[in-house]
Amino acid sequence: MAGWSCLVTGAGGFLGQRIVHLLAEEKELQEIRALDKAFRPELLEEFSKLQSKTKLTMVEGDILDEQCLKRACQGTSVVIHTASVIDVMNVIHRETIMNVNLKGTQLLLEACAQASVPIFIYTSTIEVAGPNSYRDIIQNAHEEEHLESTWSAPYPYSKKLAEKAVLAANGWALKNGGTLHTCALRPMYIYGEGSIFLYNYIYKALRNNGILTHHSKFSIVNPVYVGNVAWAHILALRALQDPKKAPSVQGQFYYISDDTPHQSYDDLNYNLSKEWGFSLDSRMSLPISLEYWLAFLLEIVSFLLSPIYKYQPPFNRHMVTLSNSIFTFSYKKAQRDLGYKPLFSWEEAKQKTTEWIGSLVKQHKETLKTKTH
């Protein structure tokens, strides 16, 4: 596709900025449009360095602003839609999550149809597939098993419906007479430098004398490095641009994992941070069944108090299930259809993430020094 352009939504985010960096290396790409609600000053500076490789247009706007989406899509060849509200603790209002994740996706699909954008790639999540119960054992699952989340929690529910909307839009007629082709990527839990989940977890441990709290020692999952997820998006757009590969990719979803060892979330956090003296909490944790029912009771308390007081439980049943399930997936279909293989090995991903955690430790020490002087 000569002289093509690409719009990335959520371009200022953890994954979105990696996609922008990889896009800047693509041949014949004339313009990247980076859309987000706001861009941090340091990211603006970082993106400005990419201008020497390709034209980069920053668009600050809301995914629910139809006029903004219309302008952003005009003259664009590909849309990569990563913008999303992620919330597993039910802290954010349900309506906000449903609006951004579902309505925002629907509005963007409509904007693509009006602006005749032929390719749409959606960043979904493993949570659209479950896990539905911590008792279920799902190992090396694949797309043909058609696993589906039954949770009504707003994040997995909104992402599930949005993904369905994206795949159903495959084959839509475009305003110029062309056809819209879509696909969705379902990454595992994404880790790497800049992860807000990892950032919060490490800072909590730093305030706790370097002790990493137990959340999920019973889980077995296959987390994926952020750089490999970004790479999968590039391969998906290349496949949809390739007349030979495109027919087998159109309307499909793909699990995206890599060669990170299958392990618990607790072990992942420990393996990424142990170089800096962090250690796992040696105290006994509650049995999962007890933790699950305790979460249920806290949810009932929260519901009963809701007319007079907003009580936020420290954990919920969805979180307990997510954190304590055996839930792993194969990337063979992505390998077959997209030519996907991880760009970064486990050792490289671990080194990059560990170095970043080291910078957080250093930052924390400097903050403490400032406070004591």
From Swiss-Prot:
The keyword Transmembrane applies. One of its GO terms (cellular component) is mitochondrial membrane. GO terms for biological process: C21-steroid hormone metabolic process; steroid biosynthetic process. It catalyses: a 3beta-hydroxy-Delta(5)-steroid + NAD(+) = a 3-oxo-Delta(5)-steroid + NADH + H(+); a 3-oxo-Delta(5)-steroid = a 3-oxo-Delta(4)-steroid. Its EC number is 1.1.1.145, 5.3.3.1. NAD(+) binds at residue 159. The keyword Transferase does not apply. It is found in: Endoplasmic reticulum membrane; Mitochondrion membrane. The chain crosses the membrane at residues 288-308. Pathway: Lipid metabolism; steroid biosynthesis. 3-beta-HSD is a bifunctional enzyme, that catalyzes the oxidative conversion of Delta(5)-ene-3-beta-hydroxy steroid, and the oxidative conversion of ketosteroids. The 3-beta-HSD enzymatic system plays a crucial role in the biosynthesis of all classes of hormonal steroids. This is 3 beta-hydroxysteroid dehydrogenase/Delta 5-->4-isomerase.
